[in-house]
Amino acid sequence: MQLEIQVALNFIISYLYNKLPRRRVNIFGEELERLLKKKYEGHWYPEKPYKGSGFRCIHIGEKVDPVIEQASKESGLDIDDVRGNLPQDLSVWIDPFEVSYQIGEKGPVKVLYVDDNNENGCELDKEIKNSFNPEAQVFMPISDPASSVSSSPSPPFGHSAAVSPTFMPRSTQPLTFTTATFAATKFGSTKMKNSGRSNKVARTSPINLGLNVNDLLKQKAISSSMHSLYGLGLGSQQQPQQQQQPAQPPPPPPPPQQQQQQKTSALSPNAKEFIFPNMQGQGSSTNGMFPGDSPLNLSPLQYSNAFDVFAAYGGLNEKSFVDGLNFSLNNMQYSNQQFQPVMAN
C-alpha cells in the first residue's frame, strides 16, 4: 500500500512544486500520505486489486476529495491554490500493484506504476510505462520495489513496506549561523552578499579621459578673450545712448597716481592674450575684422588716450605674454599704433 500511495503523492505534488511554497508542499504530502493510509485501512485487497477501486480514487475537480481538503488545511495551503495548480478534473486510482490517472472526463487513462511481477504487467507496452508527468521534476519511477529501501516518516504497512519517497520531509535541524558567517550574508537571507565597491568605476580625471592639459588651457584662454571682446562690443553700443542724454559737467579729474591705478585695475586680466592681427589700415572700415552687420555690432576701435600694452606687460619674448596662444608669433604683423585697453563697463 505504501508504495502505491507514494507514487500517487509524487505525481500530485509535482504540479505544486515551483508554484507554491516548497515547505508547505512537503507538509501537504506528509499529511496526505497519513490520511490516505488511514482511509485505506480495511479497504485494501491484494487478492482482488480492483475491489473498492472507486472508494480509493482521488478526484480533484469542482468537488475536491475531503482528503485533499484536510491535507491542505493541515499544511496551511489554500484549497483554491491547490486546485488551481492541479489539472482540471484529475482522477487518480490507487489500487494494489497499479496506480493510474485520468485528466478530464474523456481523457485517456494512463498508468503511473504497475508491478512487473503481476501477470497483467507484461501486457503493458513501454509507452504506457513511461507516461509520467512531464513537469514532475521530483517524480522518479520505481522499477524494482523489492530493492528499494523504506525512508518514509510513517511506519510501513503490509507487503508494500519498501518505498523511497521523493518529496523532501521537514528538516528537524534548524539553520544556524556563527557571527562570522552571518556577517557575510545579506540581512534576512542566507545568500552571500557581493562587494558592490569592486564593481564601481573609479573617478575619472582629464588624464584618464585622454585629454591634454595644454589644450584645456588654450581653450580657456580663447574663451576668456572672447568674453573680453564681447564686453568691448557692449561698451560701443552704449555710447549712442549716452550721447542722447543731456550733457552733464564732468567730475573733477582724480590725481595722476589714482588714474594709473584705475587703469591698471580696470584692465582685463586676459587682455594681454588678445591680439588683433588685421588692425593696420582699417581704422574707419566697416568691412574689416568686425563688420557692422555682425551679431556684436562692434564699432571701429578708437586709439585715443591709449597706453602701450607691451610697455605695461613687457615684450614679446616674455613667456607670460605668449602662454595660451595657439599660433606662431613669427608670422604675425603688428602696427606701430598703440592698442586700445579693454576697460570694464
Swiss-Prot record:
Residues 144-160, 237-246 have a biased composition (Low complexity). A motif (Nuclear export signal) lies at residues 226-234. Residues 144-171, 231-267 are annotated as: Disordered. One of its GO terms (biological process) is negative regulation of osteoblast differentiation. Its main location: cytoplasm. It is found in: Cytoplasm; Nucleus. One of its GO terms (cellular component) is CCR4-NOT complex. The keyword Cytoplasm applies. The keyword Transcription does not apply. Anti-proliferative protein; the function is mediated by association with deadenylase subunits of the CCR4-NOT complex. Mediates CPEB3-accelerated mRNA deadenylation by binding to CPEB3 and recruiting CNOT7 which leads to target mRNA deadenylation and decay. This is Protein Tob1. It comes from Homo sapiens (Human).
